[in-house]
């Protein structure tokens, strides 16, 4: 909820949710009806040759990968047609496996679905073995393997990634990169204009910069971490990387490398949710950040911030000039479920509730624990029978995963 004084009743919120679900349902139905009408018109491809090129391209655009392959082997003309229409691929992930030298590549056709395939590239003497498992609802999993003779597994995995990037005209929405030695100089990837969700598991800063520069300036979700979390203190991201628009404009920003984010850079971020090393951010800056939210001057839709690697944090300095309500025994009795959910989400330490000046029924939680200061919007203004009240909501209800504890 925004911090502008607006509020909705629980009934209204439930109605909004039902409308969204109904809208998505009918959009899917409309798409299915459209595809079925096309299939009926072409008579199960019996009238395929009667369609003009534009109609054929439209049909191919909606085909899944298996159907595209089946159509492509019908004729040379169909083969060229299929290859000329970009494939719908949601995301591509590729990463090195460090326990056993290999590269894992995953091609995801739809978001959060089983429509994907995963391959493992391994070296076997002078050859490359490509392994995958075929799953079935009724049969036992089948393991498959093909061999590319006189080849190197790393190079073959790169060729595969480049090939599939080209198949979708570099239009993926999600990318997960975990190959520090990816050959950037010879890559054909120039731009990934549709990418909104990015995970870079890299310790090479040049690789981080190279991949970020391929992304659009406004992204939804960005994770940058070393290859393993044991290495999170071994590499420090340079200040110039932290000023890239791909970072400053990102809605959800998670940085697990060491960073030297300054007070000024902290206030430049547009993130609604963020987590990063904040050893250079002063207590006075955190105080100002909280006051901005109290007075409705923070990032619109702000949800939470985890500020890590703070050797010392002065509670009095951070809360100076701010009215706070400690989470004492009375607060715990009044909000037992919320207290339990919050503690499960991020380990509650010394917690304080802070109300908004715009709408006092909106509030945030300030949490001090170990080497971290975390800030969460948890109190939402609601109405019941026309009477306003505060509904406390645990951050886990609006977060897709718990933050990594550095």
Curated annotation (Swiss-Prot):
Pfam family, one: FBA_2
Covalent S-S links between cysteines: none
Secretion signal, residue range per the UniProt entry: none
Listed name of the protein: Uncharacterized protein K06H7.2
